[in-house]
Amino acid sequence: MSYLILSIVILLIGILGIILNRSNLIIMLMCVELVLLASTILLLFESRVLYTLFGQIFAIVILTVAAAESAIGLAIMVNYYRLRGTIAVRASNLLRG
């Protein structure tokens, strides 16, 4: 039961971090990683309770996707910093329609 509480707490911290922090892209990326970690812990808890391997398999897939997502996100942020000189969210007005 403690895994469920831990997962919910980490999920809430990640969501609140995304909502409350609108100034730094790196902190927002870290909060997205917290949400993915919480979902992984929840799947592992489900796998342990139901005695199945599906939760563990999905957890490995989620961790793989999270690693790729963070690598791509950091590469985009490095290029954005080289272009703009800042990683502040407020300075991002590159998308014009």
Swiss-Prot record:
It catalyses: a ubiquinone + NADH + 5 H(+)(in) = a ubiquinol + NAD(+) + 4 H(+)(out). Coiled coil: none annotated. It is an enzyme of class 7 (translocase). The chain crosses the membrane at residues 1-21, 25-45, 57-77. One of its GO terms (cellular component) is mitochondrial membrane. Gene3D superfamilies: 1.10.287.3510. Pfam families: Oxidored_q2. InterPro entries: NADH_UbQ_OxRdtase_chain4L/K (IPR001133), NUOK/Mnh_C1-like (IPR039428). It is a multi-pass membrane protein. Its main location: mitochondrion. GO terms for molecular function: NADH dehydrogenase (ubiquinone) activity. One of its GO terms (biological process) is ATP synthesis coupled electron transport. The keyword Lipid metabolism does not apply. Keywords: Electron transport, Membrane, Mitochondrion, NAD, Respiratory chain, Translocase, Transmembrane, Transmembrane helix, Transport, Ubiquinone. It is found in: Mitochondrion membrane. Its EC number is 7.1.1.2. Belongs to the complex I subunit 4L family. Core subunit of the mitochondrial membrane respiratory chain NADH dehydrogenase (Complex I) that is believed to belong to the minimal assembly required for catalysis. Complex I functions in the transfer of electrons from NADH to the respiratory chain. The immediate electron acceptor for the enzyme is believed to be ubiquinone. This is NADH-ubiquinone oxidoreductase chain 4L. The gene is ND4L.
